Amino acid sequence: MNLDKEDRMPVVTVQMWTGRTQQQKRALVRAITDAMVQHAGAKPTNLHVIIQEVPKENWALAGVMGDERKD
């Protein structure tokens, strides 16, 4: 299917540890929206940003659970 630019519905998904404030998440969503408009030609009215917050105990990096990390 060939969609016109204005008909596309971009979705940006951000996965991050739980703990950011609502103000931080709002600022992040604004920055992502601005970047998608500027660099990807997205229309703000069509852009979806989904923030998935994951508890540290449900995330691992390099074989170490997030709630066990020291850095």
Which residues does each PLM region occupy?
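A domain-level signal for the structural core that forms small-molecule/cofactor-binding pockets
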Residues: 2-71
